[in-house]
Amino acid sequence: MLFLFISGCTREINPILDEMTDVRDNQTYQTVTLGDQTWLAQNLNYETDDSWCFQNDPAYCETYGRLYNWEAAMNACPDGWHLPSDQEWSALIKYLDPLSRPNAVLTESKTAGGLMKTTGTIQDGTGLWAEPNTGATNITKFSVVPGGERVPTPSGMFNLLGQHAFFWTSTEYATNSAGFRTLDYGHSGVTKGTSTTNMTKAYGLSVRCIMD
C-alpha cells in the first residue's frame, strides 16, 4: 500500500496485481486493479487487421504492443474486456489525482502521468523513455511505455517511439475522429484529446483494455 501526498491531502494508492491469458493467442498480460477498475498493465499485442508493430518490426511488438487504428481498437480486446471510454480514463486519472480536471482542454492532470510511467531512461540504459522522463515513479504499476504512433500516410509513417504514449478511447467526437490520452517524456501529466485536438481514426495508437 502506498500513500501519495497531494497539496496537503493524503491519497492512498493500492495497486493489486494479477495476470490474465488471452485465449485467442495464449499471450499472458499483467493486470492491475486501481480503485474499482481493473486494467491491463501492458499494451495489447493481439494481431488484427489494421494493427502494426512499430516500423513493422515484430521485435517492437514484444516490448510496446501493437498500434491499432480506432476501428481495430474497438474490437481488439478479449472477451470480458473492452476499449475504455473517455469517462473510464477520467475515472482512473481522478483516482490518481483528485485535482484532475476531466473537462479541461488538453492537460487533464499535471501529476498522474508520472505515477503511471515506467522509470528510467534510454540514455542511461535503465528504461524505455527518452530523458528526462519527468516525474516517472510507476507507483501505480500501470507501467506506461512510450510506443509512439503510426501516421496514416500512404506507406505508413512511425513517430515518437521513446517519447510519447498514445492510447485510444472508445469515445467518438466526430465521424472520423475519436478521443485519446497522451503521456510524454517531458511532462508528468496526462493530456486529453478533445473535439478540437483529436486524431483521425486512421492513426495507429496503443490500446489498454479495461475489464467489463
Where are these regions (language model features)?
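C-terminal motif of bacterial Sec signal peptides marking the signal peptidase cleavage site
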Residues: 6-8
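Sec-dependent signal peptide recognition
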Residues: 1-2
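Conserved positions within compact, well-structured domain cores
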Residues: 11-212
